[in-house]
Amino acid sequence: MSPTISHKDNSRQRRSGMFGHALDMKSGPLPPGGWDDNHQDSVGGEGDREVLLGDVGPGDFPKAKRSYRAELSSILLLLFLYVLQGIPLGLAGSIPLILQSKNVSYTDQAFFSFVFWPFSLKLLWAPLVDAVYFKNFGRRKSWLVPTQYILGIFMIYLSTQVDRLLGNIDGRTPDVVALTVTFFLFEFLAATQDIAVDGWALTMLSRENVGYASTCNSVGQTAGYFLGNVLFLALESADFCNKYLRFQPQPRGIVTLSDFLFFWGTVFLITTTLVALLKKETREASVVKEETQGITDTYKLLFSIIKMPAVLAFCLLILTSKIGFSAADAVTGLKLVEEGVPKEHLALLAVPMVPLQIILPLLISKYTAGPQPLNIFYKAMPYRLLLGLEYALLVWWTPKVEHQGGFPIYYYIIVLLSYALHQVTLYSMYVSIMAFNAKVSDPLIGGTYMTLLNTVSNLGGNWPSTVALWLVDPLTVKECVGASNQNCRTPEAIELCKKLGGSCVTALDGYYVESIVCVLIGFGWWFFLGPKFKKLQDEGPSSWKCKRTN
């Protein structure tokens, strides 16, 4: 199942998660020690300092260790910026569930899934964000302020168009192409804002308190995603609002997507103006030289890293390692909605998972802290593959327990337990990969190196999900019942079948075909390539060190 609450990993990719379509966590917070203070130097150096307007000047920073209370305003600002970042991510994650309730094809869902790619690809333009800026305005504000203004204006404009795009007017079908382009731009802007905020976080806080940046990231984006996804889906549902929040039933929910977009667009504009006016970036006398030239240097460095035999082997293996999970992760949640499970109920099932998603990385990191973190990845993989079959069984069972348009409480308990077990295996693999990436990254270029490895890891989950969604319809076999000599292979044939008094009945659901094939591919990878993946741990440090030519 795909997640309702999705984090972005501290590479900083998130997620996301990636972000999936209904219940799956693509990633989570870093294990303890995953935040590297030395990354500060790679982003902006200690020459960049930010102070509130009217605070002490750059030369007045105390030498003694600073309490977090002294920087509470900066910590709260970071937290709020990450909450804002989570809003468009959560909204984008809710759209597939809304589309599924409108019976769009899985081919359309596959097309829309490209929306979740920008966070995995932001490494392509991150060097530009780091190096190009207006010195007088501030290195990070040069990107943060215009990006958030564009997001706010975009949201307000979209609030006037979204009902038409979703087909809520005059019974039209959803305009999936326009929705995909729109939310792809949303995700692109959110990813750009993420680059700017991550960089600002490392210099806004003192070196003693920079670790709070990771906490702000994880907590803030989770809260934002919750607001934009879980809370929105609940308040948008007329059934949910009438059942739990109203005394008199109404034909629609408390809020609409149009209302939600307008509200948050206004919040973006107001708060961005306040940040632009009240929060200043100041620099000490030292100036980072040749930053523009650094763009070219960074891209050359990335190419040099990926050409290394050990890194290339890692990339090829990790890009194929998640094929076995693609049907379970990308399609299951949508199938449950198709079978009648209310989308807002699926979203709310993620709420009790939050404590588990916080605790799991802490527990698992104890077993990945040694010299061979990939052993946990290898051991968890077959259990996660088997849970994919359990998910398929759950989808098959769902219509059999539906009663009077609803589902009994024991059904939701079983779904929740299945999701919890899935989270254990998912986090075991995720924390294992993060620990390995941190272990092998060349400390001299740690920020760039680890970001590259984590980007490839996240792409390894994105492309199989898109392919899995795209293949559901071609693999599904439907028969025309009630009209002779007809089939249901094309949309035109389906319409003709209906006109002749027949109906199209699914004889073989492509989801079940995919589930079995994916698990077989997954076990094939685990048996033949898994040992080679583990063997990467035996490579010496020299295999992972990049030889730079200056």
From Swiss-Prot:
UniProt cross-references to Pfam families, sorted A to Z? Acatn
What's a GO cellular component annotated to this UniProt protein? endoplasmic reticulum membrane
- In this UniProt entry, the residues modified to Phosphoserine are S42
List GO molecular-function terms, semicolon-separated.
Answer: acetyl-CoA transmembrane transporter activity; protein homodimerization activity
Q: Which SUPFAM superfamilies match?
A: MFS general substrate transporter (SSF103473)
Reaction it catalyzes = acetyl-CoA(in) = acetyl-CoA(out)
UniProt KW keywords: Endoplasmic reticulum, Glycoprotein, Membrane, Phosphoprotein, Transmembrane, Transmembrane helix, Transport
Question: What parts of the sequence cross the membrane?
Answer: 75-95, 114-134, 142-162, 257-277, 301-321, 345-365, 376-396, 406-426, 510-530
The membrane topology term of the UniProt record is: Multi-pass membrane protein
InterPro entries assigned to the protein according to its UniProt record, in alphabetical order: AcetylCoA_trans_1-like (IPR024371), AmpG_permease/AT-1 (IPR004752), MFS_trans_sf (IPR036259)
The reply to whether Nucleotide-binding figures as a keyword in the UniProt entry is no
Spell out where the chain is glycosylated. N103
Superkingdom of the source species:
Eukaryota
**Ranges per topology, Cytoplasmic:** 1-74, 135-141, 278-300, 366-375, 427-509
Any ranges marked Extracellular in the topology annotation, and which? Answer: 96-113, 163-256, 322-344, 397-405, 531-550
Task: Spell out the subcellular localization from the entry.
Answer: Endoplasmic reticulum membrane
**What does UniProt note about where in the body, tissue by tissue, this protein is expressed?**
Expressed in brain at all developmental stages. Detected in hippocampus, hypothalamus, cerebellum, cortex, olfactory bulb, and the ventral and dorsal anterior olfactory nucleus.
Gene Ontology process terms (BP): acetyl-CoA transmembrane transport
Role of this protein = Acetyl-CoA transporter that mediates active acetyl-CoA import through the endoplasmic reticulum (ER) membrane into the ER lumen where specific ER-based acetyl-CoA:lysine acetyltransferases are responsible for the acetylation of ER-based protein substrates, such as BACE1. Necessary for O-acetylation of gangliosides.
The entry's family comment says: Belongs to the SLC33A transporter family.
Please give the subunit comment from the record. Homodimerizes.
What PANTHER family does the record tag this protein with? ACETYL-COENZYME A TRANSPORTER 1, SOLUTE CARRIER FAMILY 33 ACETYL-COA TRANSPORTER -RELATED
Q: What is this protein called?
A: Acetyl-coenzyme A transporter 1
Instruction: Supply the source organism for this entry.
Output: Rattus norvegicus
Q: Which gene encodes it?
A: Slc33a1
